[in-house]
Amino acid sequence: MSLISAAADVNDASSTTSAGSVRSSAVYRKDGKPLSQEALYRAQQKYGVFQSPARQTGSGLKDSKMASDVAANLANNNRTTIEAYKRVLDSNASRAATAVSSRSRSSSVTSNATVVTTSSKSTNAAVKALSSKPVEQPVAPKKSNMNMSKILVGAEAAAEKRIGIRMKPEKIVYVPSKESGKAAERSMSLTPEIMDKLKTKGDYEAEAEVEADPKKYASKAAFAVRDFDPNEATEKELLEREKKKQAYFGMLTSPQVLSLARANAQVKLDQIDKAAPGSLYKNEEFNKLAVALAQKNSTKRSEHHGKINMGGGLWLTQADVQNIAQGLITPVLDEVDSRALQQRAIDEDIKQRKIDFKEQNAAWIELQRNKLSNDKMYSRETRMRHKRETEGLHARTERKFQDLCASKDSEVAEMEKALQNAKDSYAALQKQMEEDLEKERLRVEAEVAALKKEQEEDLKAARVEQEQELKPYVDDVKAAEAEHERLTAERDSLNKEIEELRASIESHKVRIEELDNEISDSAAKHEEEEGKREELTKHKEEFDQEVSEKFTVIAQAAKEKAQKSSEEARLKQLEVDAMINERQSELNSTELELKKEKLSLLEAMRNVTELKGEDKLDENRVKALIGMTSEEFIAENNKSVNVSDDKFEPFNEHTASTKSIKHEEGVLGEGGAKTNSDELPVKDSAEKSSEHLNSTAEKSIEPAKASSPYPAKPSMVDAVLPKDFKPEVKPKAKPAHKTPQQGAAAGGEPASAKSGVKRSPSLKQKFMGIIKGDTKSQSKPAAAATPVHPPATVKKAAPKKAAASSEADTPAKVSPAKDTAKTEIQKIAQGGPAPAPEPEHKTAPAVDNATTKSVSTLQKPTNSGIDKSEIHKIAQGGPAPTSGHSNHTRTSVYENGDNSDDEDELPDSSEAGENGIGADKKGSLFKEVF
């Protein structure tokens, strides 16, 4: 709903009447129709001048009906400056008004009637007054004195009212509206200090109750006259007049004469008062003056008949006011109309955008549902394909293992025979050595007995000689004992320190014992590990040493060379794909820019046509500029929208990479097959190539994201959603249903999952020829497919440091090549399965959202699958064995139909291999890949 309804929609017959005219006038409208009641209400609400019964807001004029005329007059004057406030009331006005109002009527009459003369005849005025007769003299009519007390009282009341209004102005409560907040900000800011100073309605009511208390009238009156001085209120003129009056009274000789004079004067004054009303209308001069004045006033009134007094001597007719008002208000009303039309257009656009958003949201939900169904189908297909490949590989590995065991058993028998011969010779040699040792022992015992007897005789003679020589030394020993006692006391003092040191040593010993226990525990663990290792290498030490030191290294070198050549070929292939995708994206972006320019040109021409007031575009000119009419261009553009959305929609699903399954059991082989340490460099190179492929695919997809055509009218969804979010709207027509086999048999062109329409392969597919319609190969068992082995070139083996770095990337601890080979041979000897080769998956570039290609790449042979003769050939510089391997990869294309029977089916846990060994790790692998 717009803010202001159109004035044309309301049939309002109200009209305004001015003083002196009865006709209905056009209130600020060119077409003669007045404004609607809603428009007037909105305008009053916007500017805060709406008068409600609950709040009386004055317009500043006595007659509120003249407010519009005064506003028009002020607008005509166009006063851009506001004069500063000036105090028009004199500070002595209230004092003068009080003094005048206090004067009585009698004092003023007496003072006016009393005339003091200084002539020489004043002394005998009383005698003449008694003797003379009253003579009637013609008295000229005088104007009656104006009663100034009423005028001054009114002026004082008006002044007090104006002062009260200025001191306590009326508070204006603005009506809430869109502009009320801005107007309040422009006028003033209601800070907390100002809000505290403002009085509320309750404050005013409390003050009124206090003022209305009759007990406080006397105190208020006394407070009002606290500064009043009656002596200052009398004027100097009155004081001088009273002094002269008293001096005149003092000159009179008799009070009787004064009383008689007063009586005569009063009689004359009464006669004048009685005669004035009768002579007023009979006086001819008065009548002439009245007629002249009436004619003059009538002439002045006739000059401004039918005009409006604008104040300040300005009189305008109703037509002039209408012209001024139309010149000022019409642009505002036109702007209101234009904004109302714009608001209606915006409301309509919002409504249409909501409809478009709902449709696009429904399409996006449908797209997500199809994505989930495709994920289920792809996971089931991948699981079945892995099962087929694993069964064939297991059979071949068992056959090779049996042959290897037969050959190695014969070699072990020969080595055991040689070992028995060596043991026999060792026993004979040991017997001979025991006889020689017995003879030597008897000879040594005889020599020792003779030597012992001779030494005893020499010892007796030496003892006698020693006693004689030691006698002087005995005395020295006694002296030393005395010294020893002295040192004993010193030793006791040192023992205390020693005890303290021993306590510290004991604490260190406790810590040493703890460390010894830890060392013993670690030694026990080490011995346990050594026992396990010796158990594995008990009977086959010489054979394992030969394999680990010579044959394993040679086989690993050959494998590294083969893998390197394969990765180089893949790198070349990916570089070619990246170049093709880059050129395709540049071509698409150029076509998109051309369409945008054409579309902007059509938009500009349409705007020019609307401004000119024409209904249709100049199709001849449009055809001359862009080569086709506007309808043809729009139809072609809409057609290209669907094609571009289907063709360049990014496909982010990848098959299982080597990195994601290399540590999972139960995927390629049963019985817990483990990854060999010599395959780690191959995994690293495969991971690097997959990362390079992902980055290349992302670069080629980025221009395709922006390939959606520029819409003729911007949408709210385009402004809110990200640029790469362009959901495909599903067409209403139901497509023809196809099975994956039927789609693959239709010439190798993938069918769309949405519409079922065959789409031509992309430029990359045409150039490289990747898609091959080989549907028969998919129905064959997996055992028919032989593992691919790339040609190996004779190069230097990878350095040990690189191998160590690749082994360090694996999460599990990898033992040296020697221990690994021993462990695998021990498993083979115990009847376990041979370690299965690890498959490597390469993600092909996505062609369509519903089409994917799962490419099974090179299968790497294991150490157990290489014959000894082949290893000697590789060591001598010969070519790597290629028997049993093919030099090509197979590409399987799967298509998704709309009527797939297993869209909502969950993976069946009853399939073969699902509940076997490593089933839980298969589930985790499924979550990681999809």
Curated annotation (Swiss-Prot):
Indicate where this protein resides in the cell. Answer: Cytoplasmic granule; Cell membrane
Write out the GO biological process terms.
Answer: eisosome assembly
Basic and acidic residues bias: where?
523-542, 676-691, 721-731, 919-930
Choose one Gene Ontology CC annotation of this protein and give it. plasma membrane
Q: Major location, coarse class?
A: cytoplasm
A Pfam family cross-referenced in the UniProt record is Eisosome1
Q: Where is the composition biased (Polar residues)?
A: 849-866, 883-894
Topology of this chain in the membrane = Peripheral membrane protein
Q: Which ranges are annotated Acidic residues under compositional bias?
A: 898-908
Q: Where is this region: Disordered?
A: 1-34, 98-143, 516-544, 637-930
Q: Which UniProt keywords apply?
A: Cell membrane, Membrane
Give me the stretches of Low complexity compositional bias.
13-27, 98-129, 703-715, 740-755, 781-804
Summarizing the function annotation, the protein's role is: Required for normal formation of eisosomes, large cytoplasmic protein assemblies that localize to specialized domains on plasma membrane and mark the site of endocytosis.
User: Which family does the entry's similarity section mention?
Assistant: Belongs to the EIS1 family.
Its protein name is Eisosome protein 1
Q: Which organism is it from?
A: Lachancea thermotolerans (strain ATCC 56472 / CBS 6340 / NRRL Y-8284)
